[in-house]
A protein has these predicted regions:
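Hydrophobic cores of alpha-helical transmembrane segments in multi-pass integral membrane proteins
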Residues: 1-20, 32-59, 77-109, 115-177
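Peri-membrane helix termini and adjoining interfacial loops of integral membrane proteins
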Residues: 14-24, 63-68
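Short, flexible active-site loop motifs that bind/organize anionic cofactors or intermediates
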Residues: 25, 70, 111
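Membrane-interface segments at the starts/ends of alpha-helical transmembrane spans
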Residues: 26-30
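Juxtamembrane inter-helical linkers in multi-pass membrane proteins
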Residues: 61-78
Length: 177
């Protein structure tokens, strides 16, 4: 299965020993920043899943003469879209706090709130994309698919931040030996 394959790759190919944490990084902000970041990504993952379910349900509902499926047990597309939006409303302030907590921690550790580290830049890109989604959904009347596609792009940025930036970029967030 894909999960077992990824776990196997993580253990054999992608694994690196973590180096000793620099003394300047030992702070209460480590626990706060990492915990809130992890929780906010979990909430964004739920929102992403709901967005995918919405797109599938919307397609099924617009298909004439479709056969019954397990999707009939889920709410209608409009309800799924509203739920997707509601979960993003919870996730976005958490991500905002993640970025702010990281900036406070960076100021303590390196003397600057912002250092143009690849992880910082992608965290800001994520924030901008989700802000655009929430703004478009709330004020410009973008409903349904148009808005959900922006949210899905935001989750794509999260994947880039954790899968690409962590593996291929070196910066202040690179702590492996």
């Amino acid at each position: 299965t894909p999960v077992l394959l990824n776990l196997g790759l993580a253990i054999t190919v992608w694994y690196t020993d973590a180096s000793e944490l620099m003394p300047s990084l030992r702070s209460v902000w480590l626990a706060i920043h990492v915990a809130v970041a992890t929780f906010s990504v979990a909430v964004f993952t739920i929102a992403f899943s709901l967005g995918i379910l919405y797109l599938v349900q919307d397609r099924l509902e617009s298909t004439p003469g479709r056969k019954r499926s397990f999707m009939d047990r889920l709410p209608d597309a409009r309800s799924l879209e509203r739920l997707t939006y509601a979960v993003h409303i919870v996730a976005f302030p958490l991500w905002t706090f993640t970025v702010i907590a990281g900036a406070i921690w960076a100021r303590q550790a390196w003397g600057s709130y912002w250092n143009w580290d690849p992880k910082e830049v992608w965290s800001f890109v994520i924030w901008v994309v989700y802000a655009a989604y929430l703004h478009a959904r709330a004020t410009t009347g973008w409903k349904r698919q148009n808005a959900v596609w922006i949210a899905l792009a935001g989750y794509g940025c999260i994947i880039i931040n954790f899968a690409v930036v962590n593996v291929f970029f070196v910066g202040q967030h690179s702590y492996s030996g």
